Amino acid sequence: MHLIINKKRKGDEMEERIWDNSTISCFQTCRRKYYYQYVRHLRPKVKGTALLFGSAVHDALDVYYKNADREQGAVLAIAKFKEVYSTPEGDFLRTVENGVKLLTHYFLKYKHEPFTVVGKPEEGFVFPIGSILYGGRLDLPVEWDGQLWIMEHKTTSRLTSSYFNQYELDKQPTGYIIALEEFAGRKCSGCIINVLEPWKEVKRVTAKTKQPGDHFLRKPLTRSEELKDRFRYNVQAIVRDIKWCEEHDEYQEAEKKEACFYYNRNCPFMQLCQYGENDRIIKRDYVVEKWIPFENAMRKEG
């Protein structure tokens, strides 16, 4: 069920298209990638292992936090993980067994959570920013010591002290914080990044070997009113640029390592940028899958 926030103001001309973080971030990364992914609606036939594993963990945590009985929730969550995920060939880290181990130790470490869940996990939202609609999903809204927070689940294969730096100015948490404030009608203190790191058993344990509980970390991030205002402005500016590109059918390639090679893997559309839009390659390696966030959402008129 989608959470539709009814905040339309009189006189506003609201467009029906819903913009989200995935669309906007993709355009900022590379306009050509945006063209392939959101104009031509191409998706690689083979999805990345990290993405599949992270998605399965998200599904499991969604089941876990929806259940008031945590012990029962843990059993159902692990069953859900096994249902939606299978071990990819050649990956010895993101296996079903390691995923079950990861979730089991997560439930042990956070057996007694210091917060209560507000509403439902993975609730969808849509709210206006100027004349556009912005949408997404909230992983886990929580009440902690009388304060409202949004918790965002992340998985990583390398959890270091610098891991959280990437989220200090990231738009995604900022959008979640604003969305929760719009929905709740009260201040959201910030976004808690909840990180889970899968691990393989080591053959020789040393003093530096992580204990199971060390594979989980949380960090609260806050956003000033200035940053939230800047988010609103930037989202509208980026959407304006996207519309210009769509109107003029012009999408430049970024052609820089940060866009073409990231997280130790090639951009899924690299070969199309190298060799052109070859129909044979497209038919072989991609599927057409249109991205329409909240297609069935009904927006209330104010």
Give the residues covered by each predicted segment.
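RecB-family 4Fe-4S metal-dependent nuclease core
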Residues: M1-G302
